[in-house]
């Protein structure tokens, strides 16, 4: 359904279980149906993440680079933190803190300079929404869909995304879709 309705599709891939299953289902679908297209993959690299997550993301990219258009994003957007009594946010890949980075910045990643919409006051989820619009325009797409795998039990906002009764902003009244902008949608085809 989604590959017929949207000419431009990308997966928001954290490296976790839900987004990993979703991305692998898309990869499998593209390969089994011999689709002559690539699928975008958006990975927000938070710098301080589990080593096995980083290894899984890198392996997935490496093994499927023939059909993936990879956006490995290493940008110093603001991220909420509860690990400090002195800071309300932190910034992954903050150049002013380079000496304290948890690990080296990955090669071939996208940096703040690659995104004309980026500004220093931007939070991670604001960046994500702006990325969707930028990606849609970059591809001169008719209709763009970002595929997201979520755990609805993790927060009330996530649960409402799927089970809420706001259908005005859905695609063809499908409860697992949300309109982000003109011809720009998020879809949550798998959720638990």
For the regions a language model picked out, list residue spans one by one.
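ATP-dependent adenylation/nucleotidyltransferase module used to activate substrates
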Residues: 1-191
């Amino acid at each position: 359904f989604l590959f017929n309705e949207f000419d431009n599709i990308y997966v928001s891939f954290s490296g976790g279980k839900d987004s990993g299953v979703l991305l692998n289902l898309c990869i499998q679908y593209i390969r089994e149906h011999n689709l002559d297209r690539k699928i975008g993959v958006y990975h927000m690299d938070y710098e301080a993440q589990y080593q096995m997550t980083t290894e899984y993301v890198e392996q997935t990219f490496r093994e499927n680079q023939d059909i993936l258009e990879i956006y490995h994003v290493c940008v110093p957007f603001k991220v909420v933190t509860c690990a400090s009594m002195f800071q309300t946010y932190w910034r992954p890949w903050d150049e002013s803190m380079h000496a304290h980075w948890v690990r080296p910045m990955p090669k071939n990643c996208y940096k703040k300079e690659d995104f004309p919409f980026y500004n220093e006051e931007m939070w991670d989820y604001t960046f994500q929404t702006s990325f969707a619009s930028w990606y849609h325009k970059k591809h001169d797409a008719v209709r763009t869909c970002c595929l997201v795998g979520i755990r609805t039990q993790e927060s009330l906002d996530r649960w409402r995304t799927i089970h809420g009764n706001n259908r005005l902003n859905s695609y063809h009244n499908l409860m697992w879709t949300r309109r982000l902008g003109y011809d720009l949608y998020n879809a949550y085809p798998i959720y638990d």
